[in-house]
Amino acid sequence: MIYVISITVFASIIFILVGLLLLVEAKVVKKDDCVIVVNDDEGKGLKIQGGTTLLSALSENKIFLPAACGGGGSCGTCKCVVEEGGRGLLPTELAHLTRREKKRNVRLACQLKVKEDLKIRLPEEIFNVKKYNAIVVSNENVATFIKDLILKLDPGAKLEFKAGAFIQIDVPEYELSFSEFRCRVAERFRPEWDAFNLWGLHSLTEEPIFRAYSLANPPSEKSILHFTVRIATPPPGVSEAPPGVGSSYIFNLKPGDRVTLSGPYGEFFVKETDKEMCFVGGGAGMAPLRSHILHQLNTLKTKRKISFWYGARSKKELFFEEEFKGLEKEFENFEFHVALSHPKPEDDWKGMTGFIHQCLQDNCLSKHDDPTEIEYYLCGPPMMIDAIDDMLDSLGVEPKMIAYDKF
C-alpha cells in the first residue's frame, strides 16, 4: 500500500510540474503576431507568429542568417544586434559572445525566442544571401568517408561569392539505413566500413534542418558548385551515438537528385596583402583551401609565395593530389606538400610521415627566415587546428596572422 501511495504522490507531483510549465509558457511566450523591424525600416516590419526563434522567423521571410550548426546554438555564427526587445541573454549564448558584443546587445538568433516586438540590426551583406535550387551532377567517394559532391544550379542562376565562403544545404525530413550506402561507397573503401561495422547505422530527421558546407570551387565557377563532405560517424566504441544528420543525407545523394541551398556566407577570407601564404589542411578541410588556391593562382595570377600542406592518414585518403601537383609545375610561386600519419605497407610511401603540423615545422618553419611574417590559413579537424595553433604560438606567430575554419 505504501508503495502504491508513493507512486501516486510522485506521479501527481510530475503532473503538477508539467502543468505549471505549460502555464508559464502560455503566459510568457506570446502566441499572437509580433513585429520585427530590421535596420529601422518601419514600413517593412515582419509580422510573425510569437514563440518561434528569431532565426526561423527571419528565414521564413527570406532573410538567411548563417548558422553553421543548423540552429543548434553550438557555432555562434547567427549573430545580430537586438536594439529593442529580446529580454536578457540566455546561458546558451554567453560562451559565443565577447564582452563588447554583450554590451552592444548582440544575440544568437537561433536561441532568441520571439515573445514580443523586436527591433534588430543586420549587416547589409546578409541581404545578398539568396535561396538556390540545384541538381546533383555527381557524388563520388574520394576517400573512405569523404564524398566529392558536385551540384549544378538551375539554368540562369549564378552564385556570387568569395573564395573561402560556405553555403547552407537544406535537409528535408528523411530516414535511411546505412545499408543503403553499400552501392554508393566505392568498393576500395568498403573494408574500412566493414571494420567499423557502419552498415547497421540509422539516420533520420523528423523536421527540415540545414547544414553548412564550404565551397571547394573558385568564385569563377558560379553555376557548378563543388563540395568535399565527410560523413560524421559515431566515435569508435560509442555506437549508440547517432551519425551526422546532414552528412548522412548528402552521402546518400545521387545524380539527378534535387537540392535547395542558401548563401553565400563566411569570414574565412584571404587578406589582401603581399605576404607569403601558408595553407594547411586535412580531411574535408580541403574544400575552402582548394577554393582559395585556385582563385589565387588561376584567377588573380598572384605573385605571392604560396605553400599548401595537407595531412592524411594513408595514401587511400589522398584526393585532388594530381591537380595540385599540376599547379606546382605550372606556378613557380606555389609548393604542394603531403604528409601521411599512418602510411600502409602497400602505399610504398616515400614522402613525409607524421602529423602535418610537425612536418610543417620540421621541413619549413624551422628553416624559414621569419615564420611570424607568414599568413596562415588552416582548415580541418579541431584537433589538427589546435595542434597547429599551439605550434605557431610557440614560434611567436601572432593570432592576427592566423585564420582558421574547424571542420
Where are these regions (language model features)?
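Reductase modules of NAD(P)H-dependent flavoproteins
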Residues: 2-71, 82-103, 303-407
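Fe-S ferredoxin-like electron-transfer domains
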Residues: 20-27, 95-152, 157, 177
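Residue-level marker of beta-strand positions
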Residues: 53, 60, 77, 119, ...
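Cysteine-centered iron-sulfur cluster-binding motifs in ferredoxin-type domains/subunits
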Residues: 66-76, 109-113
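Ferredoxin-reductase
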Residues: 133-255, 339-342
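Short, conserved phosphate/pyrophosphate- and ester-handling motifs at nucleotide-, phospho-/glycolipid
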Residues: 164, 285, 381
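A short, basic/flexible loop-to-alpha-helix module at the beginning of a structural domain
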Residues: 249, 262-275
